[in-house]
């Protein structure tokens, strides 16, 4: 009885279908894109059959066969349901259509049966003319199939007629009077584009690459292959990497087996040669568990090697795609930028009619989420990071409970590589289908309880599986880490204290739609600044002890080294302790001295942790709200140190995580099941041609930064709760928006080098060009300037920024880069010229203040709906930055002064902007003002300079 009660907690009740059966049934009966399904536009036959994305490809390939079969003939095929019914239901329901006819030419359902026994005119003559026009347009834009060196036999395809005898007779009479096809067209061979076509091996590689590009079924998987090929630096580098990985795995397993089973360690002390301690035929004397494990790992290695061989063909296809269609060779792929690859993909999309527009209007509904028209930089990033964007949002919104379920470690978060694998297995593979799309079942609240219960069981099952797999993984990782880093630590013992970001920190720092290589570049540039920040804090007690240990160990090592130099033959064999010679103690004291010396900072290091952390934040873009005003505190340092730990500690946590991961999967994550199901339902949006995406990853370029409604002021509490729930924390979305525009901005190929960030290593002390903390404003001012109630926060202001010229630069000057459209974004993704205006809620303490009042503008024409405050003067109740932005919003023309702040990424007030000078025309001033004009300009400059302070100059 007790056993049945326990099992009933994990098994579904009797008589109710499993959640997986419900998901499979829903996936089988629902279209991949449910926009048409929800709108009631899905085409169905009498049996309720749905269409798949493959049907569009069949429709396109059969258009070539229209040289033999007219659209009228396809219509006549649909007029014979009785003939199809005679063959039996087994053939009609078979998934393999031997007739070669696509389902879009299916038999008409009873609701659409136009056949009537009293009709005097053949059904083919009742077809409207627009079908011919539609298919003719399709055929005109379709590329020719790849040519072959041989021609198949010409065959005449019989044209099916109506089902009744009278209609068949009338049909023959109509054909005699008006033939539908010419004889030469009837004798033309019907070439069908298919992956199984044998003549593809003999075609030209370029035409074959173009054909494969035109027949891509899953655009997400194809773009992932393109990106993986880019990261792998070509086919030969990828193959070499995989071969070396296989050899590394084989060496670790083989060498570990040799060390544990083939050496008799009891004979080591008295033996002189290796043969004295070797065990003969050691593999036959291995234990049963060791033999089973060795065979299991051997089979795994063989499977990986076989998979590597199978991938050669796919890599060759990708090599041809890069070389022939994108014009990128294996030597150039190591130096070309991803932005250039995206640009060439967009050019290929526009140049290839089969992918750009060779789809008729009646077939576009089949495209679903595989539209190649939606393939600019934003769409490609969303496709590549469809799952990663959800995980970034889960980490940002703290949906996952990653704390250890241990009483004395409940405040410790654990997120290792092993736990990440389990999360992808339990959550992502559960929510996404085989095509990489979110299952529409998760978007309906009617199945919330069943889906949540299924997710909870997946967590528990994964925890059980980790118990059996963990011992093998622990042994492998320990041996691999030992073989890899022991020699490095032996040569340079100070590397033991080297640090790197934890896996949890990487997911916290990563932004939406930020590809891995761009994120890795940004994070790698932050390492020098992060190490400098950690070393900034005073460690007086540790420094004193480390200095003493370094002095003692260095003195002992120096004496032993000097004695060995005087008489090396005698002294190197001298035993200081039993069986411990001078050489042994030289290694010990030298290692201790190196470690202790590494803990002592340089004497010339200037202590300024606040400035050092600002430099780190400029790269990581991570600044929690509770850090405001506390960057100098030790609490912030400890919190940052948890994200930036020593490599040896990260490795130990990875090993321990294999023990603690089952407990997290059993006790913590099942409690988050309801929140996880709600998260995917509430933060998923559908984009036409793309499918379902994370709502945070769909940037509204037209609205820019003003994407959050300020709400009703009469209910501030309710507005804040709802806005906080549907927004990201710590300004993640705005930082992602800015970062994306900087990575894929206008002319990213280097025509404007001033917009590219130059990397400089951290100085030993703040440079003379950096203002002191007092002149830069307080930390609270900086946080208030960049953070708002709704989470619209950008990175901290500092002297340097990975976004090119700092938007919040210490001088307070605006970014005068041109708002030219990006060539990597389609027109509907181009940033709006009014997308960067400040929100209605400004900072409580503006960071940059001008000591003089802005004169009213006189040279601009304001819109009729603008208030007098926006067009002239200043209102003390409104922020100065918003007033400045509004004063230039109604200008006309295309000059800098008329564009105003709409395209600028600087949220601070521009003290030296041209608009503050009364809106004068620069061309009029520079072009022949005369002596009097120059005198007036000089007087104006002297008048303005008197009121300025040293801030911002």
Swiss-Prot record:
Residues 148-161 have a biased composition (Polar residues). The chain crosses the membrane at residues 243-263, 292-312, 545-565, 581-601. One of its GO terms (molecular function) is phospholipid scramblase activity. Residues 459-479, 648-668 dip into the membrane without crossing it. It holds the Pfam family ATG9. Residues 1-242, 313-458, 480-544, 602-647, 669-953 are cytoplasmic. It is a multi-pass membrane protein. One of its GO terms (cellular component) is cytoplasmic vesicle membrane. GO terms for biological process: mitophagy; piecemeal microautophagy of the nucleus; protein localization to phagophore assembly site; reticulophagy. It is found in: Preautophagosomal structure membrane; Cytoplasmic vesicle membrane; Golgi apparatus membrane; Endoplasmic reticulum membrane. Phosphorylated by atg1. Atg1 phosphorylation is required for preautophagosome elongation. Residues 93-103 have a biased composition (Basic residues). Residues 22-39, 62-76, 104-114, 165-182 have a biased composition (Basic and acidic residues). Residues 264-291, 566-580 are lumenal. Phospholipid scramblase involved in autophagy and cytoplasm to vacuole transport (Cvt) vesicle formation. Cycles between the preautophagosomal structure/phagophore assembly site (PAS) and the cytoplasmic vesicle pool and supplies membrane for the growing autophagosome. Lipid scramblase activity plays a key role in preautophagosomal structure/phagophore assembly by distributing the phospholipids that arrive through atg2 from the cytoplasmic to the luminal leaflet of the bilayer, thereby driving autophagosomal membrane expansion. Required for mitophagy. Forms a homotrimer with a solvated central pore, which is connected laterally to the cytosol through the cavity within each protomer. Acts as a lipid scramblase that uses its central pore to function: the central pore opens laterally to accommodate lipid headgroups, thereby enabling lipid flipping and redistribution of lipids added to the outer leaflet of atg9-containing vesicles, thereby enabling growth into autophagosomes. Homotrimer; forms a homotrimer with a central pore that forms a path between the two membrane leaflets. This is Autophagy-related protein 9. The lineage of its organism: Eukaryota, Fungi, Dikarya, Ascomycota, Pezizomycotina. The gene is atg9.
């Amino acid at each position: 009885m007790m056993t049945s009660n326990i099992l009933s907690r994990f098994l579904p009740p009797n008589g109710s279908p499993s959640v997986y059966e419900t998901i499979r049934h829903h996936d089988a009966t629902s279209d991949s894109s449910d926009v048409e399904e929800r709108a009631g536009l899905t085409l169905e036959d009498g049996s309720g059959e749905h269409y798949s994305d493959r049907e569009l490809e069949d429709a396109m390939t059969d258009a070539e066969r229209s040289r033999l079969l007219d659209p009228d003939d396809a219509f006549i095929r649909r007029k014979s349901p009785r003939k199809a019914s005679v063959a039996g239901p087994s053939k009609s329901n078979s998934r393999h259509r031997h007739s070669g006819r696509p389902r879009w030419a299916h038999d008409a359902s009873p609701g659409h049966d136009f056949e009537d026994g009293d009709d005097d005119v053949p059904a083919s003559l009742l077809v409207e003319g627009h079908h011919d026009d539609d298919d003719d347009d399709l055929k005109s834009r379709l590329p020719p199939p790849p040519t072959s060196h041989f021609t198949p036999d010409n065959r005449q395809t019989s044209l099916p007629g109506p089902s009744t005898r009278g209609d068949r007779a009338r049909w023959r009479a109509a054909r005699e009077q008006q033939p539908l096809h010419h004889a030469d067209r009837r004798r033309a061979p019907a070439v069908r584009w298919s992956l199984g076509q044998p003549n593809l091996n003999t075609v030209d590689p370029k035409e074959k690459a173009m054909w494969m590009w035109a027949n891509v079924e899953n655009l997400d998987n194809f773009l992932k292959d393109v990106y993986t090929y880019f990261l792998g630096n070509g086919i030969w580098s990828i193959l070499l990497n995989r071969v070396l990985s296989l050899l590394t795995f084989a060496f670790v397993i083989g060498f570990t087996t040799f060390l544990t089973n083939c050496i008799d360690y009891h004979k080591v002390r008295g033996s002189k040669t290796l043969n004295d301690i070797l065990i003969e035929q050691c593999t036959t004397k291995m234990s049963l568990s060791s033999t089973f494990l060795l065979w299991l790992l051997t089979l795994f290695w063989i499977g990986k090697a076989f998979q590597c061989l199978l991938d050669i063909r796919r890599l060759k296809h990708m090599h041809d795609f890069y070389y022939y269609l994108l014009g990128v060779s294996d030597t150039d792929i190591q130096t070309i930028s991803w932005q250039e690859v995206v640009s060439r993909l967009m050019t290929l999309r526009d140049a290839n009619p089969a992918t750009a527009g060779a789809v008729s209007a009646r077939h576009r509904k089949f495209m679903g989420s595989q539209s190649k028209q939606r393939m600019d930089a934003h769409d490609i990033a969303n496709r590549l990071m469809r799952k990663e964007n959800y995980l970034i949002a889960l980490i940002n919104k703290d949906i996952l409970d990653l704390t250890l379920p241990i009483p004395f470690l409940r405040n410790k978060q654990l997120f290792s590589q092993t736990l990440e694998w389990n999360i992808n297995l339990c959550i992502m593979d559960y929510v996404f289908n085989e095509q990489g799309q979110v299952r529409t079942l998760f978007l309906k609240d009617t199945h919330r309880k069943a889906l949540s219960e299924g997710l909870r069981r997946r967590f528990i099952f994964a925890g059980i599986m980790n118990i059996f797999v963990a011992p093998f993984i622990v042994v492998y990782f320990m041996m691999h880490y030992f073989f890899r880093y022991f020699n490095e630590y032996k040569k340079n013992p100070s590397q033991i204290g080297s640090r790197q970001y934890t896996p949890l920190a990487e997911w916290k720092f990563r932004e939406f739609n930020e590809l891995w290589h761009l994120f890795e570049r940004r994070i790698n540039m932050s390492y020098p600044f992060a190490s400098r920040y950690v070393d900034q804090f005073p460690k007086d007690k540790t420094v004193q002890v480390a200095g003493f240990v370094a002095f003692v160990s260095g003195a002992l090592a120096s004496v032993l080294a000097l004695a060995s130099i005087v008489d090396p033959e005698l002294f190197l064999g001298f035993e200081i302790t039993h069986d411990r010679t001078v050489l042994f103690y030289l290694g010990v004291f030298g290692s201790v001295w190196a470690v202790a010396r590494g803990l002592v900072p340089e004497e010339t290091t200037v202590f300024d942790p606040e400035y050092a952390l600002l430099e780190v934040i400029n790269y990581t873009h991570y600044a929690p709200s509770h850090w405001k005003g506390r960057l100098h505190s030790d609490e912030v340092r400890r919190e940052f140190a948890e994200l930036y730990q020593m490599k040896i500690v990260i490795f130990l946590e990875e090993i321990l995580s294999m023990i603690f991961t089952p407990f997290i999967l059993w006790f913590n994550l099942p409690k988050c099941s309801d929140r996880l199901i709600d998260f995917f339902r509430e933060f998923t949006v559908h984009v036409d041609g793309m499918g379902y995406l994370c709502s945070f990853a769909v940037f509204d370029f037209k609205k820019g930064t003003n994407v959050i409604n300020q709400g009703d002021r009469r209910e501030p509490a309710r507005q804040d709760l709802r806005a906080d729930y549907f927004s990201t924390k710590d300004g993640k979305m705005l930082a992602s928006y800015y970062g994306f525009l900087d990575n894929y901005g206008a002319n990213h190929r280097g025509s404007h080098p001033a917009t590219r960030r130059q990397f400089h290593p951290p100085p030993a002390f703040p440079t003379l060009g950096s203002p002191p903390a007092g002149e830069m404003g307080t930390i609270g001012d900086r946080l208030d300037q960049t953070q708002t109630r709704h989470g619209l926060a950008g990175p901290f202001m500092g002297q340097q920024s990975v976004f090119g010229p700092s938007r919040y630069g210490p001088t307070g000057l605006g970014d005068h880069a041109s708002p030219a459209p990006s060539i990597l974004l389609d027109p509907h993704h181009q940033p709006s010229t009014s997308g960067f205006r400040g929100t209605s809620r400004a900072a409580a303490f503006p960071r940059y203040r001008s000591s003089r009042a802005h004169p009213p503008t006189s040279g601009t024409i304001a819109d009729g709906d603008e208030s007098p405050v926006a067009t002239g003067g200043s209102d003390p109740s409104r922020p100065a930055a918003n007033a400045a932005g509004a004063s230039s919003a109604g200008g006309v023309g295309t000059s800098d002064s008329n564009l105003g702040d709409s395209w600028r990424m600087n949220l601070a007030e521009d003290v030296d902007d041209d608009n503050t000078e009364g809106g004068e025309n620069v061309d009029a001033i520079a072009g022949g003002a005369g002596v009097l004009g120059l005198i007036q300009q000089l007087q104006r400059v002297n008048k303005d300079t008197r009121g300025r302070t040293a801030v911002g100059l």
